[in-house]
Amino acid sequence: MEKTFNLTRREDGIAILMMDVPGETMNTLKAEFGPEISEILSEIKRDSSIRGLVLISGKKDSFVAGADISMLDACQTAGDAKALSQQGHVVFNELEALNIPVVAAIHGACLGGGLELALACHQRVCSDDGKTMLGVPEVQLGLLPGGGGTQRLPRLVGITTALDMMLTGKQIRPKQALKMGLVNDVVPQTILLQTAVEMALAGKRTAKPVKKSLVNQLLEGTGFGRNIIFDQAAKQVVKKTQGNYPAPAKIIDCVRQGMAKGMQKGLEVEASHFAELVVSKESEALRSIFFATTEMKKETGAEGATPRKVKKAVILGGGLMGGGIASVTTTKAKIPARVKDINEKGLSNALSYAYKLLDKGVKRRHMTPAVRDNLMALMTTTTEYKGVKDADIVVEAVFEDLALKHQMVKDIERECGEHTIFASNTSSLPIGQIAQAASRPENVIGLHYFSPVEKMPLVEVIAHAKTSPETIATTVAFARKQGKTPIVVQDGAGFYVNRILALYMNEAAQLLLEGQSIEHLDKALVKFGFPVGPITLLDEVGIDVGAKIAPILEKELGERFKAPAAFDKLLSDDRKGRKNGKGFYQYAAGNKASSKKKAVDESVYAVLGIKPGMDKDLSAVAERCVVQMLNEAVRCLDDGIIASPRDGDIGAIFGIGFPPFLGGPFHYIDTLGADNLVNILERYQAQYGDRFEPCPRLKAMAAEKARFF
């Protein structure tokens, strides 16, 4: 049986401990490694010829990417999870207690348990490579660093910096890591091992303390000051999470207790809190998302199909969406993109959009001006169909006009090769209707991005009846290269995301017309766990956009999608939302919010002919909106729009910000119980009408006490 850890001795007395998990592309820490590491550490202690130890990875591009998350699912109880954390403590304490210098030589991902392993070493040196990132992202899985990270990190880099890392899960680049004292040196990968050996030979066992500002010294150096830091962090956590995520508060408590009562007490608290989080419903939901997205990365989107390589892309339309799509194509996928627009202004906008995004990277020192300029060189523009013949994929991002899109299809089929894919970014028009203009309908597909393109992770890949499996697979692979999470959905009005969002938004509108205030509505859904409330979202998306989509959905899917007629009054009053600085909220010049907390434009109530002040309980308001979304998500599964509950969960979380700690609509239905959800829907149906009628599948599941997972 192949070993994961291999110890070799050099003539100069330095031992190299190489970690290389057999058969895996990245190193992850597993429970079964404990005895193996302990045995090696005992061997090192017995050998007096060993003067120092260097820990390095045998993998090409990763140090240790973290702990193997599947270990946690094997934990039947909190006691099992606590034992797992304690085992890590024993091994890392043993490593730290070695009486010879121990140096971690880091190249590639050094995350979670990987960073905790490095923290147990006496010094750290990392490569200056772009692939090298350090961090403790456990909070993103509803967990905390359970291998001593909550104790060693604040002692190394300071409480404020450590809390920032642990509460956000942010990843740190090499130069930043050096500046903050997380590593002792940053060197080219070619001399990484040599440098680590020299550090071990130098015999230093402790790192030089990082220089702190006077304010930080005063705050972190006294019990009173530390309490200010912890109290402030706790307030920020509640504000950001609405109390929906238990991990951040437990991270703060681990650090607070460890700094007040010592390392040993801190480790005890860490193990207990880690165990509580492992078995929490929030972490289970967040881990399900992690496993789902990992699983999806292995799929092509069309069984048995092999994607073609995309070497060149063309984007039709230089507007906000077109510019964003071109930008992620060049900067993320590193694929040349040619933007075609009917006028120079559109092209100028697309170039400016891409440049501003890249220049932000330069200002934040994530890239050099030369890298920015090289990426910009991948984007070219044209007002005619020149330089488009060899395109492998054309992404159309023009106005939502079927005749215009038909013309685009004909133009591309005339100007490009037989294999060229035509991908429409339509948000509402069925792809089958767009493909009616095509002589090669098998090449036509939907590729629905969400705005702003560079920030929103989801894309819907929409196959119509004649789309070929190869077209689907190629489009999915293209979207992944752009850094997106694609879900394949079938053709139909609203596809999946906009369809479930529409009923949620309509219900919020009904509540507004019944007298719920705008602030109350938004507050209710933010407290429930959405990133923004429905009224804020409508302002952001555009009231006019919502008005265009609603009739299409109503025509194709029925009366339940009918938008409140009162909203026509908003358009008559020229209220489009943030885009024209006139919507539900007030906007200052330049369409920027007038303050951090936006103020409601009170005049909107008069336009709608309503009087606010009938505010109901926050949870009741949220429930009415959310159950509409849940019911429609199940309908989409029944209609074959989505292939599985897993895809439905990922689409809702990454497309509209459905609360991740609930695991997605289908996981949440399992938590509620289909029978409970049916009862809630039937209660609302009796009060408000048939738009709340539970779909047949939900009723059947309720009768059988069935689950999705």
Curated annotation (Swiss-Prot):
Keyword annotations of the record: Cytoplasm, Fatty acid metabolism, Isomerase, Lipid degradation, Lipid metabolism, Lyase, Multifunctional enzyme, NAD, Oxidoreductase
EC number assigned by the record: 4.2.1.17, 5.1.2.3, 1.1.1.35
CDD domains: crotonase-like
Site feature (Important for catalytic activity) residues: 116, 138
Reaction(s) this enzyme catalyzes, per UniProt: a (3S)-3-hydroxyacyl-CoA = a (2E)-enoyl-CoA + H2O; a 4-saturated-(3S)-3-hydroxyacyl-CoA = a (3E)-enoyl-CoA + H2O; a (3S)-3-hydroxyacyl-CoA + NAD(+) = a 3-oxoacyl-CoA + NADH + H(+); (3S)-3-hydroxybutanoyl-CoA = (3R)-3-hydroxybutanoyl-CoA
Molecular function, one GO term: NAD+ binding
Lineage: superkingdom: Bacteria
Pfam families, alphabetized: 3HCDH (PF00725), 3HCDH_N (PF02737), ECH_1 (PF00378)
UniProt record, GO biological process: fatty acid beta-oxidation
Region (3-hydroxyacyl-CoA dehydrogenase): 308-709
Subcellular location: Cytoplasm
UniProt record similarity statement: In the N-terminal section; belongs to the enoyl-CoA hydratase/isomerase family. In the central section; belongs to the 3-hydroxyacyl-CoA dehydrogenase family.
Subunit structure of this chain's protein: Heterotetramer of two alpha chains (FadJ) and two beta chains (FadI).
Biological role stated in the UniProt entry: Catalyzes the formation of a hydroxyacyl-CoA by addition of water on enoyl-CoA. Also exhibits 3-hydroxyacyl-CoA epimerase and 3-hydroxyacyl-CoA dehydrogenase activities.
Protein name: Fatty acid oxidation complex subunit alpha
Record organism: Shewanella sp. (strain ANA-3)
